[in-house]
């Protein structure tokens, strides 16, 4: 299960808008999820956050 509490709000919102990314994220290992969350915490803009989320599907 996904812990939305640990997610930056912008990341959670972007993920919620992208069903494919949410499914792909849920299927990742904890380590891979953690790497993505680290990048999401460092995102400086909404556009960067969306790039991180869309990158989940394309990885």
What are these regions (language model features)?
Residues 1-59:
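Charged, low-complexity intrinsically disordered segments
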């Amino acid at each position: 299960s996904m812990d939305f509490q640990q997610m930056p709000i912008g990341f959670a919102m972007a993920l919620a808008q992208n069903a494919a990314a949410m499914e792909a994220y849920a299927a990742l290992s904890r380590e891979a999820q953690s790497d993505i969350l680290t990048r999401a915490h460092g995102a400086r803009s909404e556009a960067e956050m969306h790039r991180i989320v869309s990158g989940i599907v394309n990885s």
